[in-house]
Amino acid sequence: MDQTFLETLFPDFLEIQDQALRTSCELAMWMAMEHSGWTRENIHDVPVTLNWKNCDVSWVEHVTDVTRMCILEFDQMKKYYARHGVSFDRDLVVAGALLHDIGKLTEFVPGEAGGTVHGPNYQLLRHPLSGAILASKAGVRDDVVHLIAVHSFEGDHSYQTLESQFVRTVDIFVFQCSVHGLEKR
């Protein structure tokens, strides 16, 4: 695992104070990259979606935006949770924001003729499930694995922790901004 590369790609890994959690999250991301052929050279080619025509938002940009917004919103809103005596875990929010879409590294793969194509199992294991599996294999805590698994429509009728609800809401907002005005395929 190239920790320096990952922390350069996503400096917000350094926002995770729990060293064991940070290390397991970085390992999960590295494993996801290696599993599907994404490298230092082509990681910026991973799209956030293949389902919208002309979407020019990369996976790296999307994950960065979701994570930064989660950190900013958490730091602003934690006063309400504290005021009401509600536990709200910043490390869990940051880790979940960074990893919520790691399954996209298997859902989308580099095409043999260039570009990006759907991976061989994308219909069987959409990114929330494949991401949760990868994170679990890397030893990521179950509360982060839960967040990954329920962050998309697969989680519509599932139990949500406060942190998973929070990241999911920010993710939906950022994604909608990314595709606003584009035509769905």
PLM features: residue spans?
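Histidine-centered active-site/metal-ligand motif
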Residues: 62, 100, 127, 151-152
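Short, well-structured alpha-helical patches and their helix-loop capping segments
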Residues: 58, 90-91, 123, 127, ...
